[in-house]
């Protein structure tokens, strides 16, 4: 099972539904849930930090990003929280948008395996990661944001500024499936 920490984003149920379409069991839990409570359930194989409107209300997400040995995927606000937890900089976007944008994948990697080097995604840019921590690398960027996706250099921790769970994002299901593979789920190809 994958747990989705609910940071109050409008697409949190869409994340769960997208995982259901992939036949991956998922459960939405409050963002006040501790890492200890999560790892006490041996069926949990991965964690998604959802988007949301307010970084100050994302209670335990930074601690989970720092200390989880389970794979973690941060979406939108979740992506920002991961970066912030490791010492990255998050601030207002230069171009505040909520729109369809072109994403450019720097090179094929485990999160974007099977995804073309350029695709369209639905993204929210009110706040964004401005500087990544030293232990992360940039996986993808756009014309309006130089850091659309990141990965920890040693752990299975990923962040995406855009929303792979919505139908407007091309290959969003592939990106989510790739994360689920990192969590140990297998799929017929």
Curated annotation (Swiss-Prot):
GO terms for cellular component: cytosol. Catalyzes the synthesis of GMP from XMP. It catalyses: XMP + L-glutamine + ATP + H2O = GMP + L-glutamate + AMP + diphosphate + 2 H(+). PROSITE patterns: GATASE_TYPE_1. Residues 1-189 form the Glutamine amidotransferase type-1 domain. SUPFAM superfamilies: Class I glutamine amidotransferase-like. Its EC number is 6.3.5.2. It comes from Methanococcus maripaludis (strain C5 / ATCC BAA-1333). CDD domains: GATase1_GMP_Synthase. The active site is at 76 (nucleophile), 163, 165. Pathway: Purine metabolism; GMP biosynthesis; GMP from XMP (L-Gln route): step 1/1. The keyword Zinc does not apply. It comes from the Archaea. InterPro entries: Class_I_gatase-like (IPR029062), GATASE (IPR017926), GMP_synth_GATase (IPR004739), GMP_synthase_A (IPR023686). The gene is guaAA. Heterodimer composed of a glutamine amidotransferase subunit (A) and a GMP-binding subunit (B). It holds the Pfam family GATase. GO terms for molecular function: ATP binding; GMP synthase activity. This is GMP synthase [glutamine-hydrolyzing] subunit A. NCBIfam families: guaA_Nterm (TIGR00888), PRK00758.1 (NF001975). Keywords: ATP-binding, Glutamine amidotransferase, GMP biosynthesis, Ligase, Nucleotide-binding, Purine biosynthesis.
